[in-house]
Amino acid sequence: MSDKNSSQKNWTSWHHLLHKEILGNKTLIPDGANLLIAVSGGQDSMALLNLINDMKTQHNWFVNVWHGDHQWHKKSAKYALELKSYCNKKNISFFFDQANKNNISSEEKARDWRYKKLSERANQLLIENQKEIDIYLLTGHTNTDNAETFLLNLARGSNYAGLSNINKKRLLKHHIFLIRPLLIFSREDTKKFCQLQNIPIWEDPTNCDLTIKRNIVRKEIIPILETMYPGCSKRINSFAEKMSNYKNEQNDLSKLASLYCEDAIGVKRELLNSLCIEARCTILNTFLKKDCTKQLSSKNLTHLASSILVKDRGKIDLPDGFEIVWNKDYINLEKN
């Protein structure tokens, strides 16, 4: 029996489901890929680590682990050492970074720090390989995380783009991709998998801190909704997926509409102004994204579209040193 066939002998239904997902999307995690898995020690990331490590022979993957210590609780350094020992026993390369907790006092700052350090480690792997390869950063996001994010963004007043699914794959920078393979699983799935496989878990005590907004959604709001409407998390996740499809559809249609409104001189003002405010905002956003890296908020886009409608000529300063200028006939983007 070949190594590849024998490696499947002890696979669970979760292994086979993830394997099917990867085979169905060859570009998600290609065979022979260099992987850097972000592992916190919680059930989701530990499930991801073990699933990927069990499947690495099948796909000829090179597996590395990165762990970030936020120093948010007294045992964090101890957890990091224990996780390193766990990886060493499995012959998995382990990378570790420790934050200054005073510099990551919020969820957003902590997330930015994690992705910054992950990218630095990925760059290190690129340099060490001394050849042009891709690095795949893997995180343990599940569809339960997706439902939580949807509710948080809905409460913040996000537009339809903000209510879309978490992307399975996106390019972070040249040769570095962010991959979320576990979006086909729920948090209940990762819990059962870890229990069945006797996988150790290092639970972060801050996950129970109800001053953190996501924890309130996770520990209080979703359980109440599940009691009222059993299975609501799956339906929320399904709706977020539909919103992703809607976003993709809108992006494609807005590109066509933008081309229709443009010629070699610029965007035709009269044609743009003949459309509803929502369509004008969408087309202006598509037009601006060609050069402006920083996207305008919905509020600023609405203000811009309204100004272009009521004034025959004018200009408004934009991020990145640009300004949008218009006269009676045309709208253009210029560098200050």
From Swiss-Prot:
Catalytic activity: cytidine(34) in tRNA(Ile2) + L-lysine + ATP = lysidine(34) in tRNA(Ile2) + AMP + diphosphate + H(+)
Enzyme Commission numbers on file: 6.3.4.19
Gene3D superfamilies: HUPs
Pfam family name, one: ATP_bind_3
Comment field on protein domains: The N-terminal region contains the highly conserved SGGXDS motif, predicted to be a P-loop motif involved in ATP binding.
Assigned keywords, A-Z: ATP-binding, Cytoplasm, Ligase, Nucleotide-binding, tRNA processing
Gene name for this UniProt entry: tilS
SUPFAM superfamilies associated with the record: Adenine nucleotide alpha hydrolases-like
Binding site for ATP: 40-45
Entry annotated with the keyword Isomerase: no
A GO MF term: ATP binding
Protein name, entry field: tRNA(Ile)-lysidine synthase
